[in-house]
Amino acid sequence: MTSPRPPVNPETTADLGTTTDPGTTADPRVSLLFDSREKPVLEFANQAGAVAAACHQMAIRFHQGGKLVVFGVGGPSTDAQHVAVEFVHPVIVGKRALPAISLTSDVATVTGVAATSGMAAIFSHQLRYLATPADIALGISTDGNCASVLSGLLTARELGMLTIALVGGGGGAIAACPAVDHLLISSSADPRIVKELQVTTYHVLWELVHVFFEQPGVLAPGVVA
């Protein structure tokens, strides 16, 4: 037999976050926090067609033997590693692993290139020696003005790679670059919100690539193994 549970003491549970003060949800700062995310999320949803188009082209490249090459500076450098592992080691059991690398993982190479050729060359240099025309370049930038990412995308275009950019704010110089095949913008000036949306974006990219792989005839006759 189990013992009866002791009565709840509101004074102690409040400190544990188990009660809600109605006054806190009415605080305009709380509303502002959520409202600031509503418009960017809706604008992202309106890019569904653009996201699907990018994923279809990614799936075609993977099907033809290409790999995904991801890069970004600062916070986006960890996103690049996150994206790569999502494809190489899917979190969902049964999904096929797909080849992907992050150009931010090799610290020795990144710092070596930066020391001799400058930060702007850290991705373009690696792409010239690690990528092929069959591959996919995915550049991530919070504000769209990262010189290293822009240079990487330009080099990827020269190599004949499929180019995709995830950018924030108004898109910056990367959005204006003709070397980008697929541009996905997280429309917010707040880098925290941009980060949240970009994580969602590349999770959707991963999921839709697999959707295309699972549809017979979408990529080519007999594509589904």
Give, region by region, the residue ranges found by the protein language model:
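Short, glycine/polar-rich helix-capping loops at beta-to-alpha or helix-loop-helix junctions
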Residues: L166-V180
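A short, well-structured juxtamembrane/interface segment
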Residues: E43-Q64
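A charged, well-structured terminal subsegment
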Residues: P191-V224
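Short glycine/serine/threonine-rich phosphate/pyrophosphate-binding segments
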Residues: P76-Q81, N145-G152
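Generic N-terminal amphipathic, Lys/Arg-enriched alpha-helix
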Residues: M1-A45
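Surface-exposed amphipathic alpha-helices with a cationic face
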Residues: L153-G160
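Glycine-rich, small/polar surface segments that engage phosphate groups of diverse ligands
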Residues: Q57-A131
